[in-house]
Amino acid sequence: MRWRLPGARTTLPASVALLLLPILVAPQQLQEHDDLPSTLSVPLSPTQRSFDHHPLPTINVKSNDASALATMALAGPGRAVRARPAQASSSSAGLAPQLHARSLQDWEVEDFVLLATVDGSIHARDRRTGAARWALEVPSSPMVESIYHRANRSSFDRAQPEDDFLWIVEPSQDGNLYIYSPGPDAGLQKLGLTVKELVEQTPYSGTDPAVTYTARKETTLYTVDARTGNILQVFSSRGPITSGHGCRKVDGFDLEAEECDTPSGTLVLGRVEYAVAIQNTETGDPICTLKYSEWTANNRDMDLQSQYFRTMDQSHIYSMHDGVVLGFDHSRMDRPRYTQRFSSPVVRVFDVARPINVESPEAATPLVLLSQPLQPPDPDYGSLDDRDARVFVDCTSAGGWFAMSEETYPLVTGRAKMAQCYEKDYLRHGQPLTSLPTSQQRDALAGVHSLNGPRVVRNTPSISGPSPLELANDTPRELMRSPSELALPPALRHSTIIRKGWDNAVDIFVTILLLFFGAFIYFNSHNIQELAKQKLDVKNIIASYAQPPLSTPSTPVVESTHFKRDSSPSRPISNLTVEVTVPEEQQEGDATPKPKRDRSAVGPDSTPRVKIREPSRGPDSDDDVEELDQAASPEKPKKKARRGRRGGKNHRRGKKPDSEGESKDQADRVVDQVNNLQPQSRLEPDLQLVRTVSNDIIEMDGVLQIGRLRVFSDVVLGHGSHGTVVYRGSFDGRDVAVKRMLVEFYDIASHEVGLLQESDDHNNVIRYFCREQAAGFLYIALELCPASLQDLIERPGDYPQLVQGGLDMPDILRQIIAGVRYLHSLKIVHRDLKPQNILVAMPRGRTGSRSLRLLISDFGLCKKLDDNQSSFRATTAHAAGTSGWRAPELLVDDDNRSAIQGGESQHTESSEPAVVDPQTNRRATRAIDIFSLGCVFYYVLTRGSHPFDKNGKFMREANIVKGNFNLDELQRLGDYAFEADDLIRSMLSLDPRKRLAPLCSSLAFRLFTDLFPRPDASAVLMHPFFWNPSDRLSFLCDVSDHFEFEPRDPPSDALLCLESVACRVMGPEMDFLRLLPKDFKDNLGKQRKYTGSKMLDLLRALRNKRNHYNDMPAHLKAHIGGLPEGYLNFWTVRFPSLLMSCHSVIVELRLTKIDRFKRYFTPVE
């Protein structure tokens, strides 16, 4: 029988490939060869069939993931395996007798772990500190050995194609195989085959290529004292072996004592040794011998291993290439708990588990080894593009080559160097790779390789093909060179470095130019800033005085000695035409103007005349317009200001005398145009704001003194949009953050300040202090915060004073939603909620609280809703917010909504009034903040991940539009995972206007559904995710009490609604009693009988045992845990959806207002 690769050739590289690769790859790739099975399949006996264990979540695990260091269970990602009882009349099939079903919940992790190293040793280390306990060095052979028999042949023998291959084994589960081959396409390749699979396919002998494979497999089992590491028993396929270790005497001074000390626990540890011999079929000469040994757990415990998807205490150990191991505790946001170094890299990690309930405490407890599951070290780790392609290769002291891939061992290549074989040519022409000494091979190959490349680039001489016009035979040789070689001086053509530099001369020149430009900007930044300030000052002065007045003004012309001031801070008027004469002195702020002097008596310049013209703004402006009517004559008093109306409706004015009718009609039209274009803006001509007075600001040693505000311009805290810079400052001795903005963005600053003044009376909204203007800038003083939420989540180590007591994630999210709820109560929609705009501050001293304060900040894009308005219009071209954090309704126009006339309201399917923009046919509500908060919540709970990063960060908005999010990382939260998933899923609802379908109308009810409406801030604050354990347990007991009084024969609609969620809560088995421990069920049945398929009985059992908790035996209470948290966890671990299912039933039945449940659905003020 021949195995061939498609399209094989008789060239040397093809021969090499035919020699080795087809044997390994063909069984997996070529399905047409049916005479040799590609895998060995053993049918399960009736007692070995598996079925689902409902409470544990399904997690997809790659088959070749070894773990953080070790591998996943051999049983794969299936759930708990329970042995089905065999028939009484027949014997059990398989290797093991019938076993009772075991649950991982009945086991606890020991305080030490076992680490297997490449040199073949087993080390017991402390789980929390990494301190050494004991080491097992039997046998002493390394895990990987590779013997190449080229060294046994004469140097005069002809080189064989197989001499150019190196076999490399990854000491993970079953031993993944790699090969390295030199040549033009040199590189590391993964065969997709393991040593175990190769052994199972032997014996095999072929003629094309003429290669024979034979193999053997030997197993040894050790029983070890878990406390001392002494080997108690040895079982081997080669026969009985004496352990060589005596037992520990009870009396250490009595050497003749016969009684031995009973070990507190025993470990069963297996070692499987594989050996594969590769020989030439024709000559019988040996080619290579591969030996691989791996440490394994007892296969009897595969039922527990198949349930072990995450460690019990969130502790993981990661291995580095140089023997260093890092111990992490993922439940805490800090750096590695400990670091230890071994003489050889650690390749397997086993957690040790002990049963909680021990029948005989005096006997030695059999402990179980569980291969530690894979856990990424960081949420962003899985997004690295080339993570799975990076492999570290090295060899043992005996010359055995081994590999450690980043896919199997996260962080292993972090500090390793790239292999030198891709940079230098270590082989002379025709020299086999295996003929080199081991030291030279290691110098060339040891290091990081990439499965996607790089490949060695050889400067192989070649003959260029003819050009469209065939070259004549007398074409000079120099003209046949490449352009880069032709331009290079002949003396430098053989220098690789110079030739590469010459080929990339343009890139190098541009890089150097940019570096010089960057250095120039850096060293002259202060001078550039000063020039920019001076230019702005000159621009303001010229704009105020140098522009000639137009013959026909576009806004009213006001003639008065002074103007009535508004209570709001004064604003600068840009692009104004001002003609000023000095009026008679009067006190600033006087509400009553003094009598004007007769113009003839005083002179033509005695009365100030101010002509104001402000450029129109776009239709998105929502500021009020204060109309200033022109005085008919100097003797007439100024008319009272009148506010404009939204929507651009014109005021109807009373008629004037005929002599003024024409001019007044023209003025009315001008005012109406201003109202339409610029609603809610104020025209407050203040002559002091037109010019910037140089002595308003005092600058000394990087400190600016502006009134009561001091700005430290050399301490920059951050940068924002519109040229905004945030400095450290002080206001009346209080440390503040000073936000500096250009005067051109005065409207934005005034808008932000107005909202801050209105909303800063809340613990979770940033506080506003003052505002100053000087030198062409506006300065806003705000509360100073040491970090933002993004800083706290992504770099907690930089803020030890904030995280010293740990982070209470639910409290952080509760404060954020409380601040947003307060803004929404004031009809303020933030529109730019993201981690950067949520600041973190220390608790205030007078409150006595130790929890951090979360503050909503950056109100530059906020919208204020008018009375009876619950939404506003936005366009996709001017959608507010930050990319990746915006709601889908801001990104997609609603084409299904009919066009509405501008300035009118409409009723949507949710019966909410909306303000319609005539330029678009779409609205947006407070729900856009809820969507952004859903992304922020996920970001906080997963420590930096984004729910829409499924295909990378650049696809966020595309995924948002499609509603394509992924919440799998929430499973790490444990008890709160289900509630967090439900809350965030509803907040990320694609369409906020959808309404929930009737809960009990469908038998196939799914708790996770996209029909949930996006909740408001109050509903988010009342979600069960924010309930404490006491409230959660009380709620479940109240649900049980309420439904006890429902009619049962026939059952009421409410009771049917409750029972409709039983399948979701209990799983397909529909029997909650099967998931409870035997001792608990025995104690439960003493009071009354329960039907396992009834939700009512499940809630009754939970309530009754809570009420009779003190009547339970001590050992049962220790197993369950204390009230309320331990007892609640006992139930929610087995029934994760119980709380949310009952919550949904109460909401659907509209029972939230009755006295029993009212307190759960009332937000705390």
Curated annotation (Swiss-Prot):
Compositional bias segments (type: Basic and acidic residues): 591-600, 611-620, 656-668
Residue numbers spanned by region Disordered: 547-668, 899-919
Domain KEN, first and last residues per copy: 1029-1163
Subcellular location, record wording: Membrane
Catalytic activity: L-seryl-[protein] + ATP = O-phospho-L-seryl-[protein] + ADP + H(+); L-threonyl-[protein] + ATP = O-phospho-L-threonyl-[protein] + ADP + H(+)
Transmembrane segments: 505-525
Binding site for ATP: 717-725, 739
Signal peptide: 1-27
Molecular function as annotated in GO: ATP binding; metal ion binding; protein serine kinase activity; protein serine/threonine kinase activity; RNA endonuclease activity; unfolded protein binding
Subunit structure, interactors included: Homodimer; in response to the accumulation of unfolded proteins.
Family statement: Belongs to the protein kinase superfamily. Ser/Thr protein kinase family.
Function statement: Senses unfolded proteins in the lumen of the endoplasmic reticulum (ER) via its N-terminal domain which leads to enzyme auto-activation. The active endoribonuclease domain responds by cleaving an intron from the downstream cytoplasmic mRNA hacA, allowing for the translation of a transcription factor that coordinates a series of adaptive responses that are collectively known as the unfolded protein response (UPR).
Protein name per UniProt: Serine/threonine-protein kinase/endoribonuclease ireA
